[in-house]
């Protein structure tokens, strides 16, 4: 183990475990590793667009491992050992469980972190989304075509650039003039709408100044300043 003092009463910690070469490791959230088995991969422990880390894995050797240190860090799954690194924590904290199946291991994990409620039926239906629908008419026409063809459409997603300025968190009225009518029409089709908020805020947005004043922005990844 490595336990080095840092600023603000924090420590840089590293913990190594022996790992057999034939072990297969799965999990760790959403990471573009190019494969399912994480053996041989290095996972950076931070969140960003299209990278969503959950520091929990299951092993073909019958155990699950949760790295319970909320800080920037790294997980290294080498041929002969596994190393967990935290760049700023107050103690080394991890949880290990075992089971006869992956399902049993995952059940133990949920016992300590919380069980997710069952999704409503509509949420397991077909979701239609693309990077951008430019206008309300374009968005509605896609849903109407689904209906004309008799295809089920559970959720229709309004994604990128539906705003005037990013961070407004409302539809641009120049291109989405009547949201209430749009919602009513899709509701009559049995389709729900989901809007992807895109949580960036540009300086031209009406929300930038009040959020900046209240210190609501996150900092850079190294914690040195606001973004």
Q: Which stretches of residues belong to each language-model region?
A:
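Catalytic and substrate-binding clefts that recognize carbohydrates or anionic sugar/phosphate headgroups
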Residues: 1-121, 130-132, 136, 143-148
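Aromatic-lined carbohydrate-binding/catalytic grooves of carbohydrate-active enzymes
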Residues: 117-227
């Amino acid at each position: 183990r490595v336990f080095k003092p840092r600023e603000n009463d924090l420590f840089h910690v590293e913990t190594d475990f022996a790992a057999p070469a034939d072990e297969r490791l799965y999990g760790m959230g959403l990471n573009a590793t190019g494969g399912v088995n994480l053996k041989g991969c290095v996972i950076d422990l931070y969140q960003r667009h299209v990278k969503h880390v959950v520091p929990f894995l299951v092993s073909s050797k019958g155990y699950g491992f949760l790295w319970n240190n909320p800080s920037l860090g790294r997980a290294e799954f080498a041929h002969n050992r596994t190393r967990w690194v935290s760049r700023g924590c107050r103690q080394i904290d991890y949880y290990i469980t075992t089971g006869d199946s992956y399902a049993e291991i995952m059940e133990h994990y949920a016992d300590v972190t919380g069980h997710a409620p069952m999704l409503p039926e509509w949420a397991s239906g077909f979701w239609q989304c693309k990077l951008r629908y430019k206008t309300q008419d374009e968005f509605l026409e896609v849903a109407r075509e689904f209906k004309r063809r008799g295809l089920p459409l559970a959720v229709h997603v309004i994604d990128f650039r539906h705003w005037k300025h990013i961070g407004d968190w409302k539809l641009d009225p120049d291109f989405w003039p009547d949201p209430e009518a749009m919602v009513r029409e899709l509701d009559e089709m049995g389709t729900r709408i989901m809007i992807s908020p895109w949580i960036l805020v540009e300086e031209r947005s009406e929300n930038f100044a009040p959020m900046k004043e209240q210190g609501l922005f996150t900092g850079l990844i190294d914690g040195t300043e606001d973004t």
